[in-house]
């Protein structure tokens, strides 16, 4: 049995993910889905899982905690970000939006995104929980009127009453990540079966020699 856990990006996606995982469950692969905000203690107790699916800060923390484990990144793409920016514009009508996330490769497309959502955009790097708090504070200081971000920053904004739009991951992106994890789990299961067969053959050989 190979154990797989997915950290749901948001609580409202737990139901959808649960339905999807029930369809994929097999005798060889066992799925679980959970959601936690911030840096919960549970991250230190995942040794019994063979494959983990996570995004953002949680993903980076898990890579540091479990360097030898199979960890699938659940990342949003440009379409997800643009959808959130347009939703932010419709909801809050801001002239300045702080885009708070780990922004590899985003600088090049920032002018285009700014034009599409008709607002000034500024990037704020978020790598961990402390930098998430720092990013929200920097947005206040810089006069940003709203924020577009992932889960940790969104929760901070909700606590502080700062206008914020959460970047939702499309179902297709979720399904691709889960399929990738399922394929990895199948490979792990196959390798374990091979190892068990070899071990059995060696044990039988030893018994034959002793006889």
Question: Which residues fall in each region the model found?
Answer:
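Sensory modules in modular signal-transduction proteins
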Residues: 191-211
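Short, charged, surface-exposed secondary-structure boundary motifs
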Residues: 16, 80-88, 109, 131-136, ...
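Short, low-complexity N-terminal regulatory "tails/caps" that precede and couple sensory modules
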Residues: 51, 101, 142-148, 153-193
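Structural motif
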Residues: 6-12, 33-37, 54-57, 75-78, ...
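Short hydrophobic/aromatic-enriched beta-strand-loop microsegments
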Residues: 29-31, 69-77, 118-125, 163-173
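Helix-enriched interaction subdomains in cytosolic or periplasmic regions
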Residues: 42-76
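A short, well-structured beta->alpha microelement
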Residues: 26-47, 77-86, 119-140
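N-terminal basic/disordered segments at the start of proteins
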Residues: 2-22
């Amino acid at each position: 049995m190979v154990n797989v856990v997915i950290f749901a990006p948001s609580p409202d996606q737990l139901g959808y993910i649960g339905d999807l995982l029930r369809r994929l469950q097999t005798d060889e692969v066992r799925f679980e889905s959970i959601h936690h905000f911030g840096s919960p203690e549970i991250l230190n107790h995942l040794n019994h899982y063979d494959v983990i699916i996570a995004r953002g800060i949680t993903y980076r923390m898990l890579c540091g905690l479990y360097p030898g484990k199979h960890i699938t990144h659940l990342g949003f793409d440009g379409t997800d970000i643009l959808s959130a920016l347009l939703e932010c514009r419709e909801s809050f009508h801001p002239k300045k939006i702080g885009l708070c996330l780990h922004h590899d490769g985003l600088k090049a497309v920032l002018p285009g995104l700014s034009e599409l959502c008709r607002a000034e955009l500024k990037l704020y790097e978020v790598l961990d929980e402390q930098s998430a708090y720092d990013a929200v504070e920097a947005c206040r200081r810089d006069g940003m009127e709203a924020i577009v971000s992932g889960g940790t920053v969104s929760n901070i904004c909700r606590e502080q009453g700062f206008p914020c739009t959460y970047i939702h991951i499309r179902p297709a992106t979720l399904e691709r990540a889960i399929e990738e994890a399922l394929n990895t789990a199948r490979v792990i299961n196959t390798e374990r079966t091979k190892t068990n067969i070899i071990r059995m053959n060696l044990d039988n050989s030893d018994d034959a020699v002793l006889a």
